């Protein structure tokens, strides 16, 4: 059973879905396109955390086609023709409502892209910082 089905079964309507790292990259576009009319996810806000977790090279050449095959039709998918880490994370940020710079080593160009996006950005929080309060304030901004 996938998380989407479990959320529905529990009759829980999330207010925020927080995606961590590149591995969760398709979640924002699925929520914004495929589940946009679903009452459970219609008003959900999406936060994306960026880490120093770049992968070398590119994802499979058919990655864009796989996303399209799932029913996503969007002109922004063309950035995935070159599915490098940087392009994938730019794509993810375009569908997020807020962005977290979750480690000190986040790619500088991606951090700048986040800051210029006009979306709420939570800068890196050192482990000793009052992180929970800062995250709560960030979520309230979404």
State the predicted function of each range.
Residues 1-142:
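Catalytic cores of nucleotide-sugar-dependent glycosyltransferases that transfer UDP/GDP/TDP-activated
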């Amino acid at each position: 059973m996938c998380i989407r089905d479990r959320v529905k079964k529990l009759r829980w309507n999330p207010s925020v879905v927080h995606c961590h790292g590149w591995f969760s990259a398709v979640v924002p576009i699925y929520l914004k396109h495929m589940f946009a009319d679903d009452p459970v996810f219609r008003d959900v806000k999406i936060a994306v955390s960026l880490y120093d977790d770049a992968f070398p090279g590119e994802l499979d050449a058919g990655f864009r086609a796989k996303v399209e095959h799932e029913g996503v039709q969007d002109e922004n998918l063309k950035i995935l023709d070159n599915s490098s880490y940087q392009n994938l994370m730019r794509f993810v940020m375009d569908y997020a409502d807020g962005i977290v710079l979750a480690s000190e080593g986040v790619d500088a160009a991606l951090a700048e892209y986040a800051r210029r996006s006009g979306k709420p950005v939570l800068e890196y929080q050192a482990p000793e910082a009052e992180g929970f309060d800062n995250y709560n304030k960030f979520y309230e901004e979404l």
